[in-house]
Swiss-Prot record:
Pathway in which this enzyme or protein is active: Protein modification; protein ubiquitination
Entry-linked Pfam families: UQ_con
Name of the protein this chain belongs to: Ubiquitin-conjugating enzyme E2 S
Active-site residues, as the UniProt record annotates them: 95 (glycyl thioester intermediate)
Sites of N-acetylmethionine modification: 1
Entry's Gene Ontology BP terms: anaphase-promoting complex-dependent catabolic process; cell division; exit from mitosis; free ubiquitin chain polymerization; positive regulation of ubiquitin protein ligase activity; protein K11-linked ubiquitination; protein K27-linked ubiquitination; protein K29-linked ubiquitination
Subunit structure: Component of the APC/C complex, composed of at least 14 distinct subunits that assemble into a complex of at least 19 chains with a combined molecular mass of around 1.2 MDa. Within this complex, directly interacts with ANAPC2 and ANAPC4. Interacts with CDC20, FZR1/CDH1 and VHL.
Known function: Accepts ubiquitin from the E1 complex and catalyzes its covalent attachment to other proteins. Catalyzes 'Lys-11'-linked polyubiquitination. Acts as an essential factor of the anaphase promoting complex/cyclosome (APC/C), a cell cycle-regulated ubiquitin ligase that controls progression through mitosis. Acts by specifically elongating 'Lys-11'-linked polyubiquitin chains initiated by the E2 enzyme UBE2C/UBCH10 on APC/C substrates, enhancing the degradation of APC/C substrates by the proteasome and promoting mitotic exit.
Xref: SUPFAM superfamilies: UBC-like
EC number of the protein: 2.3.2.23
SMART domains recorded: UBCc
Leader sequence segment: none
Length: 223
């Protein structure tokens, strides 16, 4: 995609540069901005999935594209990370009012990013680009949330409700296997059957000693 920097007036470029620099140094909570040094009109962004939503624990990559008419016209927003959301189309396009009819030249990039993050908390089924997600949100929220969580786990880097960390008190399959396979682990087979194992070891040593004694007697008889 061609850069729009050359199409923007110098004073707009300075304003964009100033805001992007501020956003990079002091981003909104849960949002990080990665400016494109070669193209200031192509902003790469990551947004953390808000807690209490099906997107919690996920990290979503997106981009904002500033057109040649910016700020008279709103930027275009796209999710680069696949997400199940009513207001995100199959190509990642984001449908939110602030990027359309509610846009004014006074609104800045920070406002856009905060609005998109809020969209993860409060989806709007009335302006759905993903009709299935919009329908489920209205008719069967549990199914909608399950689908959203699944895609978040697959594509957003989430491993569960705590973002990939096992929940307290819940053993993982690998942890259980490790405990079973390690006979020296506390509470494992060796720990639970220590006295019995020692008893068997003692009996085995006695049998070996008796066998050696018998073999020695047989050897003496041959002499």
């Amino acid at each position: 995609m061609n850069s729009n920097v050359e199409n923007l007036p110098p004073h707009i470029i300075r304003l964009v540069y100033k805001e992007v620099t501020t956003l990079t140094a002091d981003p909104p909570d849960g949002i990080k901005v990665f400016p494109n040094e070669e193209d200031l009109t192509d902003l790469q962004v990551t947004i953390e999935g808000p807690e209490g939503t099906p997107y919690a624990g996920g990290l979503f990559r997106m981009k904002l594209l500033l057109g040649k008419d910016f700020p008279a016209s709103p930027p275009k927003g796209y999710f680069l990370t696949k997400i199940f959301h009513p207001n995100v189309g199959a190509n990642g396009e984001i449908c939110v009012n602030v990027l359309k009819r509610d846009w004014t030249a006074e609104l800045g990039i920070r406002h856009v990013l905060l609005t998109i993050k809020c969209l993860l908390i409060h989806p709007n089924p009335e302006s759905a680009l993903n009709e299935e997600a919009g329908r489920l949100l209205l008719e069967n929220y549990e199914e909608y949330a399950a689908r959203a969580r699944l895609l978040t786990e697959i594509h957003g880097g989430a491993g569960g409700p705590s973002g990939g960390r096992p929940e307290p008190g819940r053993a993982t399959a690998s942890g259980a296997a490790a405990s079973t396979a390690d006979p020296t682990a506390p509470g494992g087979p060796a720990g639970a059957e220590g006295p019995m194992a020692k008893k068997h070891a003692g009996e085995r040593d006695k049998k070996l000693a008796a066998k050696k004694k018998t073999d020695k007697k047989r050897a003496l008889r041959r002499l």
